[in-house]
Amino acid sequence: MSLDKTYKLVPGTTVFDAEQSAKGYHLNQFCMSLMTAENRAAYLADERAYLDAWPLREEQKRALLDRDLNAAMREGGNIYFLAKWGATLGFSFQQMAGSMTGMTEEEYRAMMVGGGRPVDGNRIDHAVLEAAHADPAPPVEHAVITGAVFTSHVPAIGAAMDHAKTEEPYWRPVFEGYAFSRQWERENVPDVIFLVYNDHASAFDLSLIPTFVLGTGAAFPTADEGYGPRPVPGVEGDPDLAAHIAHSLIRDDFDLTLANELTVDHGLTVPLSLMFGDVGKWPCKVIPFHVNVVQYPVPSGARCFALGRALRRAIESYDRPLKVQVWGTGGMSHQLQGPRAGLINREWDNAFLDRLVTDPAGLAGVPHLEYVEEAGSEGIELVMWLIARGAMSDVDGTGDVEVKHRFYHVPASNTAVGHLILENHPRAEGPAEGEN
């Protein structure tokens, strides 16, 4: 089904949504640049020259030069960002708001002193609202999830590839375990990969610790993790699908952080290298999805599994015929710190792989303590696999999954390597619906 955007029907109102954000991204970032005295002085000295240094559309520049806030809003401006511009010019919020109503400043102030604008006469027309809420026809075409890939994202694996060590005796067994996977991926190239990973203190430090981060930008460069960026292609995003997913997941009560700019580290690039090899450009678009598994509390397996189910609904309600894969990365058992560093638990890992296939809902109930005790402090990354598993159609009985490949190997640096490919075979009734 299409997403509910009836907020657009409220008269005289611009709700700043993903469409507005995309349209006005550089306009609003320009406004943010005015938060330093030096930049404010430069702007006031030559407004046109300052604006020309930004990748703004001419309509956006003209709106600012003409002091036309309604035009700036139509061009994607947000009032809180535009307030920085207004403050630079000496405007108050009342002056800015009043300028958009057709009233003089004195008339607007008098209205506010008198109690403000009444809501009567400023609501949505009921007939228009009822028509908007009429049951829409399901999309003729929609995106489908074709499969899930689960894999460890060990940084040393990326280093082995980058330094031509893949044929060394230590590393050869690891890469042999992905030979089938690369062939499968060549035969099943998706349009988009929704790639679940965790950042390793590369894009996020302790000044900002979001739980779930959805990459909504057009491009994501490779992070420098202390050794220089990996020599791999940057990632091309899919802002339209990402915006749709954001709207759907947040509507389903998952609180996301949206990142229009984001560098991606080995958590994302190593899985791509393992599945696609050494390429000049990744063969599909990638939507990064970061999960905090670094600082407790981290999301539970149950929450991640529920998010995966909601993700499937989001993707299948997108009205473009895209093939989408969902990847869950990280793990398996490993501990990188403390006297227990080096912990590996083969038995637990393989039981996890078994249950991931046959009992994902039960596996989602495993508590954090078991992950840490049995799989090591960094083994908690495995909750991210449950997002990808929750997105498969067998979870709600509307399809089946097929195991195409399974691989497990120790050692790979400090970590047990696990890998699984599930093909998704939904039935043809239509997009998924339902509750979390």
Predicted segments, located by residue:
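Flexible, D/E/H-enriched segments
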Residues: 137-191, 206-306, 317, 339-436
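Beta-strand elements within well-structured catalytic alpha/beta cores of enzymes
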Residues: 191-197, 289, 322-330
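Acidic/polar N-terminal loop/beta-strand segments that form early-domain functional surfaces
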Residues: 48, 152-154, 195-199, 205-206
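Charged, low-complexity intrinsically disordered segments
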Residues: 1-138
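Hydrophobic alpha-helical segments and helix-packing faces
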Residues: 20-27, 36, 238, 300, ...
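Catalytic metal-binding/acid-base residues of hydrolase active sites
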Residues: 199-201, 332-333
